[in-house]
Amino acid sequence: MIIFYGLFSILVLTSINIAEAGHHNRVNCLLPPKTGPCKGSFARYYFDIETGSCKAFIYGGCEGNSNNFSEKHHCEKRCRGFRKFGGK
């Protein structure tokens, strides 16, 4: 019985950590797009909280943030379902 409770506790703690990690990753969807100071010109996608959709932007190549995806479907997969409170 002690083994059962031990395994159950491990399962619960692991589930909590996984849920928190997923939430942390999705918080990146709230960041504004950041081109950065470098002079590169990379086509990227960011999640626009106002519209609830992923949009294209040009990334300079350095000092961006985590709301920066190389492909639109990656952006959509990560940020799907986010909307600004009070949004239409």
Curated annotation (Swiss-Prot):
Changing residue 82 to A: 58-fold reduction in KCNA3 inhibition. Residues 29-79 form the BPTI/Kunitz inhibitor domain. Glycans are attached at residue 68. Expressed by the venom gland. InterPro entries: Kunitz_BPTI, Kunitz_BPTI_sf, Prtase_inh_Kunz-CS, TFPI/VKTCI-like. GO terms for cellular component: extracellular region; extracellular space; host extracellular space. The record marks 77 as: Pore-blocking residue. The record marks 39-40 as: Reactive bond for trypsin. GO terms for biological process: envenomation resulting in negative regulation of voltage-gated potassium channel activity in another organism. CDD domains: Kunitz_SmCI_3-like. Keywords: Disulfide bond, Glycoprotein, Ion channel impairing toxin, Potassium channel impairing toxin, Protease inhibitor, Secreted, Serine protease inhibitor, Signal, Toxin, Voltage-gated potassium channel impairing toxin. One of its GO terms (molecular function) is potassium channel regulator activity. It comes from the Eukaryota. Its main location: secreted. Disulfide bonds join 29-79, 38-62, 54-75. It is found in: Secreted. Pfam families: Kunitz_BPTI. Residues 1-21 form the signal peptide. Changing residue 78 to A: 49-fold reduction in KCNA3 inhibition. Negative results: has no effect on chymotrypsin, nor elastase, nor the KCa1.1/KCNMA1 potassium channel. Shows weak inhibitory activity against mKv1.1/KCNA1 (1 uM inhibits less than 50% of currents), hKv1.2/KCNA2 (1 uM inhibits less than 50% of currents), and hKCa2.3/KCNN3. Belongs to the venom Kunitz-type family. Scorpion delta-Ktx subfamily. Delta-Ktx 1 sub-subfamily. Dual-function toxin that inhibits trypsin at a molar ratio of 1:1 (Ki=107 nM) and inhibits mKv1.3/KCNA3 potassium channels (IC(50)=6.2 nM, and inhibits 80% of currents at 1 uM). This is Kunitz-type serine protease inhibitor Hg1.
